[in-house]
């Protein structure tokens, strides 16, 4: 029995807690001890009710990593309820979405975590769920764009968020639809001027970018890498100056 307990404590990285007063340790440490207690019974299935509640980010990640390892190496089925949909998306093999007293959706994460599905499930009408980042975004600031952002490769994301926090409507472009900046710009920008991936920027797309940019009070340019396909972005930057 002592060997089983030692192995369980080791599995959840709680060896140093064996002689501690349970009431004196942190919430994250308590969760690990309780999990070790369950493992001692050598179950085939573990059911957990919101195991990450009241835990800080470090302990949430640590606990979920332990559960993943248990599922893979010890072949224990882990069933748990979570309100953090970003974590559920990253850690789960199958998802059950409960709305009221009804199972609204069931499937693999990539089948369930879609923008329209999450919007309907939680009745979101003042923001967005981004399935690419697994994040919740506040609503875009409406109105005529005051700032035009020229960016690429993730360099625009902190700028988009800052403008959104300052309630400044903005436009973004020219972005390819497979650019990571596009994934957030489409949710937060008033208008996004886009081009299809791996194509040279068309006259129509370039003209629209110039038109929108000229109406803005300011232009923000990040360190945009320019290549053969997007070389007209360089021309757009020169016009901005």
Go through the PLM ranges and name each one.
Residues 1-18:
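Conserved ABC ATPase "signature" region
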Residues 61-74:
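Helical segment within the ABC ATPase nucleotide-binding domain
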Residues 96, 100-111:
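Conserved switch/coupling elements of ABC/ABC-like ATPase nucleotide-binding domains
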Residues 42:
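Conserved catalytic motifs of ABC-family nucleotide-binding domains
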Residues 21-25, 29:
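Conserved ABC ATPase signature
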Residues 123-201, 221-222, 227-230, 241:
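ABC ATPase nucleotide-binding domains
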Residues 46-50:
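Catalytic Walker B motif of ABC-type/P-loop ATPase nucleotide-binding domains
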């Amino acid at each position: 029995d002592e060997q089983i307990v030692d192995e369980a404590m080791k599995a959840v990285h709680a060896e140093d807690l064996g002689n501690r007063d349970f009431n004196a340790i942190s919430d994250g440490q308590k969760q690990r001890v309780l999990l070790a207690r369950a493992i001692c019974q050598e179950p085939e299935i573990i059911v957990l009710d919101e195991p990450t509640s009241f835990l800080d980010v470090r302990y949430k990640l640590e606990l979920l990593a332990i559960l993943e390892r248990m599922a893979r190496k010890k072949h224990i089925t882990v069933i748990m309820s979570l309100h953090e949909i970003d974590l559920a998306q990253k850690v789960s093999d199958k998802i059950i979405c409960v709305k009221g007293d009804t199972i609204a959706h069931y499937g693999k994460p990539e089948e369930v975590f879609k923008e329209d599905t999450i919007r309907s499930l939680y009745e979101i009408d003042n923001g967005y769920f981004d399935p690419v980042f697994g994040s919740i975004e506040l609503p875009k600031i409406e109105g005529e764009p005051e700032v035009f952002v020229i960016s690429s490769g993730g360099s625009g994301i902190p700028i988009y968020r800052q403008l959104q926090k300052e309630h400044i409507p903005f436009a973004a472009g020219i972005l390819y639809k497979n650019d990571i900046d596009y994934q957030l710009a489409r949710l937060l920008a008033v208008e996004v001027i886009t081009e299809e991936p791996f194509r040279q920027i068309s006259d129509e797309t370039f003209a629209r970018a110039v038109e929108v940019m000229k109406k803005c009070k300011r232009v923000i340019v990040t360190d945009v890498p320019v290549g053969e396909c997007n070389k007209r972005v360089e021309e757009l930057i020169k016009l901005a100056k």
